[in-house]
């Protein structure tokens, strides 16, 4: 591997336009687009803003191009839920809206797990879809974060697929079907922001909204060859809504985006960042890398003590070598807390908050529901797990204790190191169906615990974390470094 800065920038997709004759898109996606569409699909969001400012293209033309990309590319990957959004609303805003701000005129996708008044957001759940059919859209306003996105000039051009209630690391909801990885459509795009990731990776949009309560931005970014950042706890504007898991009390959920370039994510964070946060000085807009040389702690083992797949190990080891070639110091170490207890506690708190869904929607609908027809087996299994553990109160109390211990271990590590490097997932992108929500609960649980072993830590302790696209497997599948 050439560890030059040029190679690093190329692999990080910082170059916003492919070199002559080349493409940043998977081959099949580029082949589906007309020449002009394929060329535009190679720009990042800020690159498109520059074209708009130079009047080389209009926002309406961009929206129409996105509609064309959805028509040509989406049937293969099922990233965009065309039934949930009226594209004429996007065309109207592009045509008549006063578009100002750092993302003026850029079409984006919203994850099907947010508060948005102009589309049917059902969280990939048959239960919520039935509620909407009976009661209508519960949202009369956007969340503060979505409002900030629109004030920045972004044009919502569609809704991206997500697993039921955002509860899995793959996007295969029974309600809408599986989202497929643009690099190999037999494989998962990840979850829970899998539709957003696939839409960006396939060149449908340059940027898409995502949420992350256990890895849901970073895992799809890892699997789809994108940049994905989970911000520091409380850093971004809130998005509490009726479909929320209720995890705000533990502050483990964050929101941001999936992007093809680091600079797009930096600009997005600047747009949605809270400007007056106690103990958190503003980040502002980061225009380039720091000159500071870092001490990096490299950790290999999952929470259950397992080593990564050989391709994943190679990906992270090459990232470590790249960091060293750029002047940083990398040491192998261990995290220093009880990994199995942490993972079991994290799973328990997910289960406890999921249990609240059923009662909440029964109350909203005004009657009991037939559970097996309304919720997926994985969701039902989590509800039963929570009941067996006593519900929300004991699970929350345990989480506070265990997460505090994990925070102390991370804080101790940061007294010596500036950053932590690890895999995102223990394995490369697996095939569709391997983590299907319709599998037997214990089978899926075993697979999940075996392969998800790094990302939840940073949700629990509140540290920022990202997946950077620096490696492709011998089979042509992306593997990010964390």
Residue ranges and their predicted role:
Residues 1-16:
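N-terminal secretory signal peptides and thylakoid transit peptides that target proteins
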Residues 29-32, 38, 230-319:
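A short helix-breaking turn/cap at a secondary-structure junction
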Residues 66, 265, 296, 323, ...:
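Residue-level signal for inorganic ion chemistry
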Residues 103-132, 290-300, 349-411, 423-427, ...:
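Short helix-loop capping/hinge segments that flank enzyme active sites or metal/cofactor-binding pockets
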Residues 430-452:
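Short, surface-exposed loop/helix-turn segments at secondary-structure junctions
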């Amino acid at each position: 591997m050439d560890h030059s800065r040029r190679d690093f920038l190329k692999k990080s997709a910082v170059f916003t336009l492919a070199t002559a004759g080349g493409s940043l898109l998977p081959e099949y996606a580029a082949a589906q687009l007309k020449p002009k569409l394929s060329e535009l699909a190679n720009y990042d969001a800020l690159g498109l803003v520059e074209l708009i400012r130079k009047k080389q293209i209009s926002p309406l033309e961009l929206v129409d191009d996105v509609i064309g990309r959805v028509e040509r590319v989406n049937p293969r990957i099922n990233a965009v839920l065309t039934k949930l959004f009226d594209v004429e609303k996007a065309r109207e805003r592009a045509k008549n809206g006063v578009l100002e701000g750092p993302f003026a005129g850029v079409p984006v996708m919203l994850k099907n797990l947010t508060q948005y008044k102009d589309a049917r957001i059902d969280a990939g759940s048959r239960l919520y879809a039935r509620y909407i059919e009976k009661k209508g859209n519960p949202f009369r306003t956007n969340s503060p974060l979505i409002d900030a996105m629109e004030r920045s000039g972004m044009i919502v051009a569609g809704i991206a697929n997500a697993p039921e209630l955002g509860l899995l690391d793959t996007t295969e909801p029974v309600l809408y079907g599986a989202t497929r990885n643009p690099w190999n459509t037999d494989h998962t795009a990840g979850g829970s922001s899998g539709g957003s990731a696939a839409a960006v990776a396939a060149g449908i949009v340059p940027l898409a909204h995502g949420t992350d309560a256990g890895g849901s931005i970073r895992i799809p970014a890892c699997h789809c060859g994108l940049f994905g950042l989970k911000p520091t706890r409380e850093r971004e504007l809130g998005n509490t809504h009726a479909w929320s898991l209720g995890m705000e009390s533990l502050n483990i959920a964050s929101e941001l985006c999936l992007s093809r370039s680091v600079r797009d994510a930096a600009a997005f964070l600047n747009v949605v960042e809270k400007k007056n946060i106690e103990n958190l000085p503003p980040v502002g807009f980061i225009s380039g890398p720091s000159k500071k040389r870092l001490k990096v702690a490299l950790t290999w083992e999952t929470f259950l003590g397992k080593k990564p797949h050989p391709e994943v190990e190679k990906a992270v080891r090459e990232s470590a070598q790249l960091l060293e070639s750029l002047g940083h110091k990398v040491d192998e170490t261990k995290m220093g807390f009880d990994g199995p207890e942490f993972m079991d506690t994290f799973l328990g708190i997910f289960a406890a908050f999921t249990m609240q869904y059923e009662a909440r929607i029964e109350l909203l609908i005004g009657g009991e529901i037939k559970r097996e027809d309304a919720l997926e087996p994985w969701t039902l299994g989590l509800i039963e797990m929570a009941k067996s553990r006593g519900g929300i109160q004991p699970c929350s109390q345990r989480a506070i204790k265990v997460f505090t211990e994990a925070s102390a271990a991370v804080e101790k590590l940061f007294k010596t190191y500036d950053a932590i490097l690890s895999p995102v997932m223990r394995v490369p992108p697996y095939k569709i169906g391997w983590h299907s929500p319709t599998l037997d609960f214990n089978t899926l649980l075993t697979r999940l615990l075996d392969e998800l072993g790094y990302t939840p830590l940073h949700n629990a302790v509140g540290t920022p974390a990202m997946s950077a696209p620096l490696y492709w497997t011998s089979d042509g599948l992306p593997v990010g470094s964390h």
